[in-house]
């Protein structure tokens, strides 16, 4: 049995909430995008990219949790000069799931003590055949002999928190990050780390989607503050559970959604709410993903578990099924048991600006179509339309999501020399387009 079977007592959801049917899955993904933690904590930025922002002290972090709104930030100069923070004032941060996205987040919080060697974002699951008009990405890149090349703006070292501990189920896959922080304590089981390391103040969760909720809940129950990567959880029930638990425990929490606070996203919000393109009644969002296996495939046959992998902890609350390397390291996104597909991966980014700009609440209708799928893999391609009622002085609006090679129709008014971007807003006075993370909006 999976070692996290005990979580069944936490997440005893009605069967209809755990339904794997496509239409329900699309509705669930909308909740991934829409439900944020009630407590927003900006000391660990949503983009995790502002390397030169002012530091905050551990004493203040711990002393103002009960009044998070009154939290203050102390300039570096007060703590010992530019770029310096006393070690005793550093928040002790633990990273959980650091082989990929989580490792990038950690590096954006503190410069590695040892230069980190380059490794790909993807894993074995990125190796696939062309499908639905999508070309497979280049072969998996592995750790090279050369350190990551940084631009002049990135060469300055920084440390916004003390990387106190790092936890990953696969110390081979995450080895480049573990080696970069030799002083951090190393674990493969997040429960053991949280139980033993009482000095940990906060955790950063960058694991596969299916373990976000159980790890966040375990940390909050232990009094640890939580930053969890998007999607916050995998089901509606889990998001509500975490929301309520955050209130009960009083810890500060944040869901990471890279792009939410970049200039481009805010520019789009200002344009739309300022009426620059008039009333918006139609929005089209799309991505070229999945870049991993999705569709009508059989689950790969089980093979022996390698010694470097703590597979029980990787499974977490998921069904106890045989191991195969084609399910891990980025490829998990395409399986119902572990991921949320192309929409759950990129939709969280691309939906963000329209939800904010158009004050979207709950849809009144969802219509979805897809290519064939089965009990193991999400569909290769899908098209989902959400219908929202009028909101104040904003008219009803339809928001359509497409992936797996499906794109929206090109508007007649779009100039021939302009490419169709990943987000398209159609107003009665004009158009707005921007990229997946709200990047570079254009009128």
Segment roles from a protein language model:
Residues 65, 75, 79, 267, ...:
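Contiguous beta-strand/loop segments that form the cofactor/metal-binding neighborhood of enzyme cores
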Residues 32-224, 240-252:
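N-terminal glycine-/serine-/threonine-rich beta1-alpha1-beta2 phosphate-ribose binding loop
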């Amino acid at each position: 049995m999976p070692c996290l079977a005990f979580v069944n007592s936490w997440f005893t959801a009605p069967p209809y909430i755990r339904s794997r049917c496509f239409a329900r899955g699309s509705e669930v993904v909308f909740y991934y995008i829409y439900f944020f933690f009630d407590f927003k904590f900006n000391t660990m930025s949503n983009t995790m990219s502002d390397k030169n922002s002012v530091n905050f002290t551990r004493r203040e972090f711990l002393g103002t949790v009960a009044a998070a709104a009154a939290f203050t930030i102390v300039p570096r100069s007060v703590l010992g000069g530019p770029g310096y923070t006393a070690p005793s004032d550093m928040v002790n941060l633990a990273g959980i799931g650091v082989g990929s996205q989580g490792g990038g987040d950690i590096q954006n919080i503190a410069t590695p003590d040892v230069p980190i060697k380059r490794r790909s974002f993807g894993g074995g699951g990125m190796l696939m055949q062309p499908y639905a008009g999508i070309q497979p990405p280049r072969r998996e890149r592995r750790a090279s002999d050369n350190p990551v090349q940084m631009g002049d703006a990135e060469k300055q070292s920084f440390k916004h928190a003390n990387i106190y501990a790092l936890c990953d189920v696969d110390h081979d896959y995450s080895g480049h990050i573990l080696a970069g922080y030799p002083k951090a304590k190393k674990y493969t089981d997040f429960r053991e780390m949280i139980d033993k390391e009482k000095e940990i103040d906060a955790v950063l969760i960058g694991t596969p989607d299916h373990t976000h909720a159980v790890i966040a809940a375990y940390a909050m129950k232990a009094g640890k503050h939580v930053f969890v990567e998007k999607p916050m959880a995998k089901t509606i029930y889990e998001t509500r559970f975490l929301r309520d638990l955050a209130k009960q425990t009083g810890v500060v929490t944040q869901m990471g959604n890279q792009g939410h606070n970049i200039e481009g996203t805010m520019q789009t919000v200002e344009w739309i709410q300022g009426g620059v393109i008039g009333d918006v009644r139609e929005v089209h969002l799309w991505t070229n993903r999945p870049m991993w296996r999705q569709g009508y495939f059989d689950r790969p046959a089980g093979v022996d578990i390698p010694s470097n992998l703590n597979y029980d902890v990787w499974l977490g609350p998921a069904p106890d099924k045989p191991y195969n390397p084609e399910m891990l390291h980025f490829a998990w996104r395409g399986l119902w048991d572990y991921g949320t597909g192309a929409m759950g991966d990129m939709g969280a980014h691309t939906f963000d600006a329209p939800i904010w700009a158009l004050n979207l609440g709950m849809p009144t209708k969802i219509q979805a179509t897809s290519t064939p799928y089965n009990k193991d893999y999400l569909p290769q391609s899908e098209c989902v339309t959400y219908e929202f009622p009028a909101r104040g002085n904003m008219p009803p609006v339809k928001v359509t999501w497409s992936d797996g090679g499906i794109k929206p129709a090109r508007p007649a008014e779009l100039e021939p020399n302009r490419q169709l971007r990943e987000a398209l807003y159609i107003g009665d006075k004009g158009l707005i387009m921007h990229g997946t993370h709200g990047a570079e909006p254009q009128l």
